[in-house]
Amino acid sequence: MTRSYQKDLIVEEFKEFLEADGFLFKHGANHQEDCLKELADLVYVCYQYAENMHWFLDAALDRVHQSNMSKLGEDGKPIYREDGKVLKGPSYKPPDLSDLI
């Protein structure tokens, strides 16, 4: 599978997820299974892309998670921007993924 084709699959699955999420929003909780299925499909094709690139996605996700947790403020709570985005706190450390590629 080429990278270009894999990227097309990611875009396609993302669009299907957005459609399922919109349907869930409009029609309620009875459609959660469809939304979860589309999200899982999206993650699956992302894993395929990473595998094709010989990247260790599970390890990268762990490190990104640890990095995101380092964004907390000195009080251990997230620092939010007006729109709800979590900002980088004083202890933020970006993830080092250099050994995973």
What are these regions (language model features)?
Residues 1-39, 43-101:
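Flexible "arm" and connector segments at domain edges
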